[in-house]
Amino acid sequence: MNRLPKILVSCPTASAKNYTALEWMLNTQKFTYPNYDVIVFDNTDDNGSNADYLNELAISNGILNYQAIHYSTNKHESIIERMCISHNHARELAINNNYSHLFHLESDVICPIDTLQNLYIHNKSVCGGLYYRDSGISRKLMAQRRIYRSSRNVATENFLPNEDIDFIDGNLKTIAAIGLGCVLIDLKTLKKIQFRFMPNVDLHSDSYFSEDCFRNNIKIFADTNIICKHNNENWDLYGLNWK
């Protein structure tokens, strides 16, 4: 029987996300998909001490399939730039080591343990699960739909309050943008699209990734049966009062 291909599970992280690091690590160790490596890129502005802390945290909790790699940051880099650099470290690692896919799971997103397996089964170039940002009246689905106003006026827009209820029906759907919080990207797409950002523009590389997929005629799919927990919905639970 052919062995399932190996998938890279990765994301940027930093000391700001240490409040949920252990939960994230433990979540990744329970995946039902049998063949994957977990390697994260720590962009904390230090000498590597936070990456060391994360690796020691994993070992002390019996977690063997986990590695945090630090890269030397430039103090002039913005958070957006640091995250984009980390995204590309993950992309390059997947390409150079011939992983079949990159499963990008943000460091504060906790997914159902069969998520990776189900996304792989869909056999799409780009396919992700859903999650929310914030809570209460500020809650927003981290996904966008595409609006065709005319042949020359194509835009994306967020779901309005309560519209997500109709969208999330358990089916697989095409979508304009799904972010990088919980998304499986195949090797062919990774080779074609590099993560990018624009200096002095308040947009993260996930926005440009979705735009570049559209320009390359790569459809983005959302499995609306996959709803993840997002550990920034209420940071007060973790003793934090910032976002």
Say what each PLM segment does:
Residues 1-27:
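N-proximal low-complexity "stem/linker" segments adjacent to membrane-targeting elements
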Residues 24-36:
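Short, acidic, metal-binding catalytic loop of nucleotide-sugar glycosyltransferases
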Residues 47-99:
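Active-site-proximal specificity loops/subdomain of glycosyltransferases
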Residues 35-46, 70-71:
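Short beta-strand/loop segment that forms part of the nucleotide-sugar
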Residues 112-198:
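Conserved catalytic core of nucleotide-sugar-dependent glycosyltransferases
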Residues 98-110:
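Short beta-strand-to-loop acidic/aromatic patch adjacent to the donor-nucleotide binding site
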